[in-house]
Amino acid sequence: MADIIARLREDGIQKRVIQEGRGELPDFQDGTKATFHYRTLHSDNEGTVLDDSRVRGKPMELIIGKKFKLPVWETIVCTMREGEIAQFLCDIKHVVLYPLVAKSLGNIAVGKDPLEGQRHCCGVAQMHEHSSLGHADLDALQQNPQPLVFHMEMLKVESPGTYQQDPWAMTDEEKAKAVPLIHQEGNRLYREGHVKEAAAKYYDAIACLKNLQMKEQPGSPEWIQLDQQITPLLLNYCQCKLVAEEYYEVLDHCSSILNKYDDNVKAYFKRGKAHAAVWNAQEAQADFAKVLELDPALAPVVSRELRALEARIRQKDEEDKARFRGIFSH
């Protein structure tokens, strides 16, 4: 440990161990995932806190070798063992980009692409970005750089291949290989009744494919092939949303599928159920009629749905009549 601390000091980083970690120091080969809580503080006597992952409610996940925009974090993380708590005072040369990187940390902490919301900014918005970061403390730090203190608590270190990466952190090849596995995991979770978790898996698989699809010419064979992989995942996602009673999201997604594939029976059926749930009786009946037209074998299932819809409508009519009688009797 003494030689590690000495090497850090030579590079302008002062490490102070607050709590020793467990076991041996991991080798931190490329692809290793480090999960840790961090707190960023000013290096002055007041030690004002700039950021705190615990406030965000989720620890940071850093994958070694992915060229994170704040290289010093890879440097210091690779000196820590699981369970270790340490503080690192870093010279200005290591943290001059911190104000810019800080804007991405919120996205990373929740498993999103760190550039989300930045790629499609118009020119005026980008010019504003360069002049202001939207946070007074970060603006001040950008204009007047100073050393920073990082308080780190290493929670977990996972070797390559022992964990599932967030979609934004994968290469294109990794995304393509991961989709069937994520799909299977979503199916397993749904069968076991973990609907919310299953929806999250389907969402991740869709995100992988959408990212790959963005790199293809719309309408090209490659684009269509990816879209045909997205469709069953999106239908599974819609099934989760039906169970969760998030009907308007189901309506949106099923309509988007039917705009491209107007013979998709499952999309008509799920949209019909969603319409029925929000009292769009005519739309529900039209969708169920389309299901029968495309697949007459589903007649028993459709009849059951239509009977349930009619029963709900009758019950609602009776409740409305009773309510109106109560109003006019006063």
UniProtKB/Swiss-Prot annotation:
Residues 54-146 form the PPIase FKBP-type domain. Its main location: cytoplasm. TPR repeats lie at residues 179-212, 231-264, 265-298. Keywords: Cytoplasm, Phosphoprotein, Repeat, TPR repeat. GO terms for molecular function: peptidyl-prolyl cis-trans isomerase activity. The modification Phosphoserine is found at residue 43. The keyword Magnesium does not apply. May play a positive role in AHR-mediated (aromatic hydrocarbon receptor) signaling, possibly by influencing its receptivity for ligand and/or its nuclear targeting. Cellular negative regulator of the hepatitis B virus (HBV) X protein. One of its GO terms (cellular component) is cytoplasm. SUPFAM superfamilies: FKBP-like, TPR-like. It is found in: Cytoplasm. This is AH receptor-interacting protein. The gene is AIP. InterPro entries: AIP/AIPL1/TTC9, PPIase_AIP, PPIase_dom_sf, PPIase_FKBP_dom, TPR-like_helical_dom_sf, TPR_rpt. Interacts with RET in the pituitary gland; this interaction prevents the formation of the AIP-survivin complex.
